[in-house]
Amino acid sequence: MKDTCIEIKYRDKVYHAYFNLNVMEQIQDEFGTLQAWGDMTTAGEEPNAKAIITGLMYMINEGIEIDNEDNGTKTKPITHKQAGRILTELGLEQTAQQINGLVVDSVSDDAKNE
């Protein structure tokens, strides 16, 4: 597994959404398994809004923590409602595809972070 990141632009901010073991653990705690969460967020049938919003929140908050550590900043984590607003503006289906792609890229790569 390798840390993977996408940029999410919302209004005047750019968020880095990460998928790594920390996010994987949070998703497993909330939804049981990564597979169960993935089934809820896959495009096709109606995606589970709570699953997508929660996953996006975990990923953005991990990015905020990493940026805070790397840059000595003190940006506050986003809330569930803020993640929902971001998702609403960006589009549910498009964002679901992006975050599912992020997860697939991370877990399909056996390389370590360098």
Regions from the PLM with identified roles:
Residues 1-9, 29-45, 68-114:
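Charged interaction scaffolds used for protein-protein
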Residues 11-13:
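Short strand-coil-strand connectors
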Residues 18-19:
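Short linear motifs in exposed loops
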Residues 25-27:
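Short Gly/aromatic-enriched secondary-structure transition segments
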Residues 47-49:
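Active-site- and interface-proximal helix/loop "cap" or "latch" segments in soluble metabolic
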